[in-house]
């Protein structure tokens, strides 16, 4: 398949991140030609006020809450769910005690779509479920932030490794204008300092290195002392066992993002229940 052949070429050259950014810039140029900014701004105003991420994470954290990352495929794992139903997954996981949903919208490597984001948010609203929906993508341009809001996002998930200082500033200004929370992925103390200097208060300690796609299980413990005490802190990167959830709890983080292992499970809600989260403390009722 052409998608995977491009990825394979990047893997062989050791240019994972560079290939992703190159492809995303080309995609952005195409999207700007077909999506009118004025129409997106009108769409953005049609959604309810965004749900702040802080609203669903107790502070200080008593136990980490689970966040589900929804995607059909991943470049380092291949196809995760041949029959991918993001709305069905979202509703099953919401009933299972999930705190928030991150919907991957990158098409080239994850087989995502902006329409998946909107469909998930609409389904939650119809059932009056107050779960934040996060747009996960490779953010490079404020236009993507406007897209996120226009398709129902409450928050965006960005990676500092992919952004220049001016690029980060532009994204933060756009998110503030749209009322969106920003989750910033960090892997180094330098990136933590960048986030701190920009006043960012929601961070993801990412165990996966975007340059190699390898996972470093020890990274959160190394990075935790550098993370601001006042920040909302989540962990991500191939978390798959009750032991890893217990380790996250010991670090005092607010949440854990569950990705490929969750999506490979035949019954994701049952798999979630077996991870040892204290879900009974956080079960949400439908508003009424």
Where are the model-predicted features located?
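Hydrophobic faces of well-ordered beta-strands that scaffold small-molecule active sites
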Residues: 1, 66-70, 101-103, 133-136, ...
């Amino acid at each position: 398949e052409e998608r995977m052949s491009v990825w394979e070429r990047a893997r062989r050259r050791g240019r994972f991140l560079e290939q992703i950014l190159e492809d995303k810039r080309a995609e952005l140029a195409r999207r700007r030609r077909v999506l009118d900014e004025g129409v997106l701004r009108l769409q953005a105003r049609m959604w309810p006020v965004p749900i702040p991420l802080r609203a669903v994470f107790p502070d200080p954290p008593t136990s980490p809450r689970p966040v589900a990352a929804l995607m059909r495929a991943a470049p380092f794992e291949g196809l995760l769910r041949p029959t991918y139903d993001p709305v069905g997954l979202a509703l099953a996981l919401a009933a299972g005690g999930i705190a928030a949903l991150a919907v991957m919208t990158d098409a080239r490597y994850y087989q995502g779509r902006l329409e998946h984001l909107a469909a998930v948010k609409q389904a939650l609203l119809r059932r009056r479920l107050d779960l934040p929906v996060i747009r996960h993508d490779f953010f490079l341009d404020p236009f993507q932030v406007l897209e996120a809001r226009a398709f129902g996002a409450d928050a965006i998930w960005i990676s500092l490794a992919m952004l220049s200082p001016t690029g980060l500033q532009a994204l933060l200004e756009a998110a503030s204008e749209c009322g969106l929370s920003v989750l910033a992925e960090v892997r180094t103390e330098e990136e933590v300092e960048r986030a701190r200097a920009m006043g960012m208060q929601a961070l993801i300690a990412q165990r996966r290195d975007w340059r190699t796609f390898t996972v470093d299980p020890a990274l959160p413990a190394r990075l935790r002392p550098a993370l601001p005490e006042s920040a909302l802190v989540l962990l991500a990167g191939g978390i798959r066992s009750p032991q890893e959830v217990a380790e996250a709890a010991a670090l005092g983080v607010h949440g854990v993002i569950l990705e490929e292992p969750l999506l490979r499970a035949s019954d994701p809600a049952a798999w979630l229940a077996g991870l040892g989260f204290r879900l009974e403390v956080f079960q949400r009722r439908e508003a009424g």
